């Protein structure tokens, strides 16, 4: 994502556009694995992104331009359990890396450590030293971001849990401590639960701001921008009404003063498929396979080839060739135009519009013995092996249809949680004008450490042949409203 004012953002590139190394399971999604809490930094004319893979180790990519191309991932250290990595280049030329530990892999969590890197930041050259133990007062501390200001080293970190926690700042005159600590941001009386995993940004005009996320369930991690100032070399974030040094999040505030005014823009959403590559908002469900799709920009379409479902397939949770994107707003409508041309020799080829998460639902076209059938399906607990249930279906003769899902949220919460209650209603049309509802209202659910996504797919049973069905897709512009 790129912005010149911290408010208007667009997607400009993917630092790892294809496959994450080492490619151990290229034909199956790895839910909740691989890239955990990356950090991006700029040093000596180059951008660096570091991340921890809890099963593989510490990785880094770099580029002279944020738009790319980015280097191939470098394995900085092969190790299991290190996550949430963030580098700093010190004035004496030394390079350090702050990180946390994943309890599920390392057998230890709620501590923050620092290690030294080589001058080119391509390898770890010293042992990790624990510089903060949060077990007593700041359990589940993670996501450190490392800075230096006025002779102090600062570590910004969240603690207390993703949806329920707070922001802590450590400071010390020595990189390895001892560190003082202070809680600098908590929910307080605001509706922003668990302000989590934030970073400090200073502007060319001398202002300080803090970006963090809020976990709201099916809509994923929503980014917030908070005002920040320094008092006695401690950051004060949000609004500190009682003057105790711990602020609470604001919902509205003036824009940052960056010296100029920039046009309003939002991350890309709609797509007419008029290019020869996918627009940057699209994400495959697993490492990319070039045989999944053909991009025909001159015809404003993308053609998805039916691809065999994996061995031991239970649901779309197991399918790699889902083409998805994140939800753009609280309330919006997504419409997709597609043409389904199944191979008449094979039954069971499927395509459609899907809302994907640990529970999922969608409008599914399937080639059956009785012809093409459009069904509204839902799958509960897909992450635990759940299977699909058909709520309603109708026979269709037209090969081209418009499929639609309307997302609605009124601020209500899922019982017993801070998650927004998100309702999805499905409909279809033969002409793109008159839409007919189909099936039942679906309550969207998040994925593994991500929000729900919306998109399409094209599959067939495990028939090994190069003669599958074709799917032509071209979505119409999406109607959307923002309540956030």
Identify the residue ranges that each predicted region occupies.
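Extracellular glycan-recognition surfaces and repeat-rich motifs
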Residues: 280-305
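Blade-edge beta-strand/turn elements of extracellular beta-propeller
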Residues: 9-26, 62-79, 118-139, 170-190, ...
């Amino acid at each position: 994502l790129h912005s010149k004012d911290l408010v208007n953002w667009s997607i400009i590139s993917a630092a790892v556009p294809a496959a994450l190394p080492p490619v151990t399971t290229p034909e199956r999604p790895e839910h909740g694995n691989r890239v955990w809490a990356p950090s991006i930094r700029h040093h000596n004319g180059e951008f660096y992104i570091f991340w921890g893979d809890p099963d593989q180790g510490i990785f880094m990519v770099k580029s002279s331009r944020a738009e790319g191309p980015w280097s191939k991932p470098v394995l900085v250290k092969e190790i299991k359990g290190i996550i949430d990595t963030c580098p700093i280049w010190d004035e004496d030329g030394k390079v350090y890396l702050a990180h946390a530990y994943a309890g599920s892999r390392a057998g230890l969590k709620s501590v923050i450590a620092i290690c030294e890197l080589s001058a080119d930041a391509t390898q770890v050259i010293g042992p990790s030293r624990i510089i903060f133990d949060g077990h007593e007062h700041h359990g589940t501390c993670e996501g450190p971001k490392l800075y230096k200001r006025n002779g102090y080293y600062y570590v910004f970190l969240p603690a207390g849990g993703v949806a329920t926690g707070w922001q802590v700042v450590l400071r010390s005159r020595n990189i390895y401590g001892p560190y003082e600590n202070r809680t600098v941001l908590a929910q307080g009386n605001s509706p922003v639960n668990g302000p989590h995993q934030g970073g400090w940004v200073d502007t060319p005009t001398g202002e300080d701001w803090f970006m963090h996320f809020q976990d709201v369930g099916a809509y994923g991690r929503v980014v917030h921008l908070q005002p920040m100032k320094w008092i006695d070399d401690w950051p004060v974030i949000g609004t500190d009404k009682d003057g105790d040094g711990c602020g609470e999040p604001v919902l509205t505030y003036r824009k940052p003063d960056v010296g100029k005014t920039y046009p309003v823009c939002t991350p890309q959403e709609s797509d007419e498929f008029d290019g020869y590559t996918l627009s940057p908002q699209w994400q495959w469900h697993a490492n990319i396979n070039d045989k999944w799709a053909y991009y025909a920009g001159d015809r404003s379409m993308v053609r998805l080839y039916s691809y065999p479902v994996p061995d031991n397939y239970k649901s779309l949770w197991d399918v790699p060739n889902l083409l998805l994107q994140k939800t753009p707003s609280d309330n919006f409508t997504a419409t997709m135009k597609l043409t389904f041309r199944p191979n008449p020799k094979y039954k069971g080829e499927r395509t459609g519009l899907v809302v994907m998460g640990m529970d999922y639902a969608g409008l599914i076209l399937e080639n059956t013995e009785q012809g093409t059938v459009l069904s509204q399906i839902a799958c509960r607990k897909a992450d635990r092996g759940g299977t699909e249930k058909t709520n309603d279906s109708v026979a269709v003769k037209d090969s081209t249809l418009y499929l639609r899902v309307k997302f609605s949220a009124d601020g209500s919460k899922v019982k017993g949680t801070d998650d927004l209650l998100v309702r999805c209603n499905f409909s279809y049309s033969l002409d793109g004008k008159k839409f007919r509802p189909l099936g039942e209202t679906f309550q969207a659910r998040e994925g593994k450490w991500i929000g729900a996504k919306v998109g399409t797919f094209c599959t067939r049973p495990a028939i090994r042949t190069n003669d599958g069905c074709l799917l032509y897709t071209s979505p119409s512009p999406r109607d959307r409203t923002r309540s956030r």
